[in-house]
Amino acid sequence: MNSSGGVGRTTSALCLSVAFSEYGKKVLMVDCDPQGALTFTLGKENSHRNVYDIYSGRARALGMLQQTSERVDLIASSPKLYAVGGSERVKKSEILFDALNKFEYDIIVVDSASGLSELNRTVLAAADEIIIPTRLDLLSVRGALHIAKASEQYRGKVRAVLPTMVDPRSKHGNEMLAELTAKFGKILIQPGIPKSPLFLDAVVAGQSLL
């Protein structure tokens, strides 16, 4: 999660999930981004049962689970997620946690939107651990710091900060990396994920890099 956009949240979540699957873990991905980038990448855009049903209380959990070609299961996104928030805050703050807690998976990875919306706060409330991907630019690092601060209100802990699209030749990027190192220490994954056209190619192909 990162409150800034364009940091590689969906790509990181998908690659991490497939890696867990390769190690024999039973993995569920949950797309809580109303834009549905993960759902689109996995070819499940026309799903009639999706994560919004958790928030509306209209669906039994098992009816939302879908198998994918990437060896992980998925609960798809829906544009209706834009409606989650406002006066629903108190009622829905734990609803995602309550629903996911019933699933029998080794690992559940939730992909979120940017920002700190009420929807994203339900994701924070559901998380045991939080991974913060970030580009090495000022706005992305600022967004990473916002999420780290916001997570202090919830039981989940920041497990890792993951630099993405890293260009080791960038002076500004190296300065941002030094700032992240000072702030997060050992939980900062170094050297991070390098900038590469392979990531865009994978998105176009509708698959992970693994």
Where are these regions (language model features)?
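P-loop NTP-binding core
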Residues: 1-210
